[in-house]
């Protein structure tokens, strides 16, 4: 009989945590060692329609009614302040933190688990380096810090889903909807920026989408020939109101510039196949990210498979895998009060700020010297597909289970003591 494992996470949501949850769950299923049940949770306001007919391997395991017995292994994918013990052995998996500090509730949550798994060295270091003092009568009586083991397991790229489509193959392999939409763009050179446009004043939302748009406009406004930007973004929903709000935000920035370059908003749900077609469309030449911080940076990893160059900040989680890119300089500084998120992004923490003047030049160089810059994309594609793919992640996950998760009694080797050989006396019948 296989040991019982409960996997709890946002497996049905269209979110970064949802993507990661599905990858991890499939990795555990492939181990073929556990009787698995899944508790599917919401993730903010993100849609819960990510599981389709081809995802029966996951949907068939989702528990819908009644109580479940306490499992041998409990795996929870969430933010650490929500971590709870429900099994004999408990694993908490989180994307970690994009800043330099975590809230004390995160530390307490990590200490409730037996093992904590994060996707990057940055996330691990932030958890282990955040220390709070416990005070009593004005004196420090103890320290609050993570005492449980923290291991890094990167978010592997599914190279069967994300892969390079050569220009001459795009007509055959590219998604028709994406092709039709982007073919109408008159510009032949487009930068791609993607990610949720989160809370924060201008320049202080976590992805710094506003700052990137402004820098792009500064770089190319007034030029007779200029590139465009494709912006794939939303708040957390794909509603009409959300779309109109995104359009207004973009126009509010462009209005400050005369003859600004075009910015095309891509808003709404995309399948993985559509996203890969977006990355590979011949008009999309480069991805750009001014992100203040990433726990990992999954879109940057997935875009790498296209073989096209990336312009990005060089701080936090994506440093692990983004070896060949245009690295934007800047400095680490205090987060703005408008970006504070209760018990998640705390006011005492810091993150990265791009040097906009340097970034403006980087955008201009990517446009004017693209032939030279393409070599970065080719090198990065080779690096990501050989070191950070899904199969390599699966292998490491198996190693973590073998290292930390106690084996069931049925799998344990029984070491019996050895005895010297013994000679038994010869028995004789009575009377002989």
Language-model-detected regions and their locations in the chain:
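Conserved catalytic-core segment of nucleotide-activated headgroup transferases in glycan assembly
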Residues: 20-22, 26-27, 35, 158-277
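Donor nucleotide-sugar binding/catalytic pocket of nucleotide-sugar-dependent glycosyltransferases
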Residues: 115-175
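Extended catalytic core of nucleotide-activated donor transferases of GT-like folds
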Residues: 6-8, 45-128
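Short hydrophobic beta-strand element within catalytic cores of glycosyltransferases
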Residues: 309-312, 326-327
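C-terminal amphipathic helix plus adjacent low-complexity
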Residues: 235, 341-432
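Acidic donor-binding loop of glycosyltransferase active sites
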Residues: 277-295, 305-308
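N-terminal pre-catalytic "stem/leader" segment of glycosyltransferase-like enzymes
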Residues: 1-71, 217, 228, 395-398, ...
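Short alpha-helical segment that forms part of, or immediately flanks, the ligand-binding pocket
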Residues: 276, 301-309, 316-320
């Amino acid at each position: 009989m296989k040991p019982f494992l409960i996997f709890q996470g946002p497996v049905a949501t269209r979110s970064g945590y949802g993507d990661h949850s599905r990858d991890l769950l499939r990795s555990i299923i492939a181990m073929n060692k556990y009787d698995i049940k899944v508790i599917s949770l919401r993730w903010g306001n993100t849609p819960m329609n990510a599981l389709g007919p081809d995802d029966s391997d996951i949907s068939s395991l989702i528990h819908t009614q009644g109580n479940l017995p306490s499992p041998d292994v409990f795996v929870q994918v969430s933010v650490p302040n929500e971590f709870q013990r429900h099994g004999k052995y408990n694993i908490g998996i989180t994307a970690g933190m994009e800043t330099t500090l975590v809230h004390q509730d995160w530390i307490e949550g990590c200490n409730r688990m037996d093992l904590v798994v994060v996707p990057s060295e940055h996330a691990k270091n932030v958890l282990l380096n955040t220390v709070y003092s416990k005070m009593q009568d004005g004196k420090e009586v103890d320290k609050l810090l993570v005492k449980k083991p923290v291991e890094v397991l990167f978010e592997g790229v599914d190279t069967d889903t994300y892969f390079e489509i050569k220009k001459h193959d795009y007509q055959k392999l590219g998604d028709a909807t994406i092709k039709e939409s982007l073919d109408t763009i008159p510009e032949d050179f487009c930068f791609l920026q993607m990610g949720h446009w989160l809370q924060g004043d201008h320049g202080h939302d976590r992805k710094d989408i506003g700052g990137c748009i402004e820098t792009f406009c500064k770089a190319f406004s007034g030029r007779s020939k200029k590139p465009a930007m494709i912006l794939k973004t939303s708040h957390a929903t794909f509603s009409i109101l959300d779309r109109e709000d995104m359009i207004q935000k973009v126009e509010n920035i462009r209005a400050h510039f005369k003859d600004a370059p075009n910015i095309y908003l891509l808003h709404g749900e995309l399948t993985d196949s559509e996203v890969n077609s977006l990355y590979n469309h011949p008009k999309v030449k480069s991805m750009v990210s001014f992100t203040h911080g990433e726990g990992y940076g999954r879109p940057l990893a997935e875009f790498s498979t296209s073989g096209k160059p990336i312009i990005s900040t060089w701080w936090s989680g994506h440093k692990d895998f983004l070896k060949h890119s245009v690295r934007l300089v800047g400095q680490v500084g205090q987060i703005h009060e408008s970006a504070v998120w209760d018990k998640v992004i705390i006011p005492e923490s810091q993150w990265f700020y791009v040097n906009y003047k340097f970034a403006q030049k980087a955008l201009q160089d990517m446009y004017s010297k693209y032939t030279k810059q393409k070599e970065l994309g080719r090198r990065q594609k080779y690096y990501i597909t050989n070191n950070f793919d899904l199969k390599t992640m699966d292998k490491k996950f198996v190693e973590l289970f073998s290292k930390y998760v106690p084996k069931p009694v049925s799998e344990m080797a029984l070491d019996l003591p050895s005895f010297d050989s013994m000679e038994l006396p010869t028995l004789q019948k009575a009377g002989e």
